[in-house]
Amino acid sequence: MTGLFITLEGPEGAGKSTNREYLAAQLRAQGVQVLLTREPGGTPLAERIRELLLAPSDEAMSADTELLLVFAARAQHLAEVIRPALARGEVVLCDRFTDATYAYQGGGRGLSQQRIAVLEEFVQGDLRPDLTLVFDLPVEIGLSRAAARGRLDRFEQEGRAFFDAVRSTYLQRAKADPARYRLVDAAQPLADVQASLDTLLPQLLELRRG
C-alpha cells in the first residue's frame, strides 16, 4: 500500500480539527494506519514556531517574516513527520498545509502568489497533497464560532476583509483544480458535515489502493 497525503483546509471556525478526528476514526475502522498532524506545528520545533505565529504581540510581525516562519515550520514538519509517514505507507491527515499559506499569507496578507510558489518548490519539491478537503462557510459564521472558543489568536483578531480574502483564495484554488479538491459545506450541522465525509470514504480508500 502506498501512503496517502490528505489535507484539511478552511477558515477559522470551519471544524477542521473535529472532522479530522472523525475521518481518522472512519479510516481506522477500515484497518488503515492513520497519522494525525497539523500546521503550523507537528514537531516540537515547528510547534514553537507556531507559538510565535499565533501569539498576540505588541511587536508587529511583517508579512514576509510570517511567510518565512510558516515555511520553516513546514520544512521541519516534512522532514520529521510527513515524509517518513508516507514512506511507511500511512495515511497522513494534516490540519492545514500550503493551501493555507496561499490563503492567509497570499490572500489575507496580499503577498505575491509567485513568491509563495518559489518557497513551496524549495521546501516541498514535488510533494503535494493527494486530496484536499476545503471546509467552507460564510465568514461571519466562522468568526462567531472562533469567538465562542475564547481568547482569539493573532490571526483570529484580523478583520472581516482579511477573512473574505482568505475564503476567496480557498475557493479560487478549489475551482482551479477540481481533481484534487473537495468542497465541504461546513455551515451545516456537524452530523450533516460528517455524513458528507462518509460519502468520500470510498474515494479515499480507492486512492490508497491506487
UniProtKB/Swiss-Prot annotation:
One of its GO terms (biological process) is dTDP biosynthetic process. Transmembrane segments: none annotated. GO terms for molecular function: ATP binding; dTMP kinase activity. Signal peptide: none annotated. ATP binds at residues 10-17. It holds the Pfam family Thymidylate_kin. GO terms for cellular component: cytosol. Disulfide bonds: none annotated. Keywords: ATP-binding, Kinase, Nucleotide biosynthesis, Nucleotide-binding, Transferase. Its EC number is 2.7.4.9. Coiled coil: none annotated. HAMAP family: Thymidylate_kinase. Belongs to the thymidylate kinase family. Phosphorylation of dTMP to form dTDP in both de novo and salvage pathways of dTTP synthesis. PANTHER family: THYMIDYLATE KINASE, UMP-CMP KINASE 2, MITOCHONDRIAL. This is Thymidylate kinase. It comes from Pseudomonas savastanoi pv. phaseolicola (strain 1448A / Race 6).
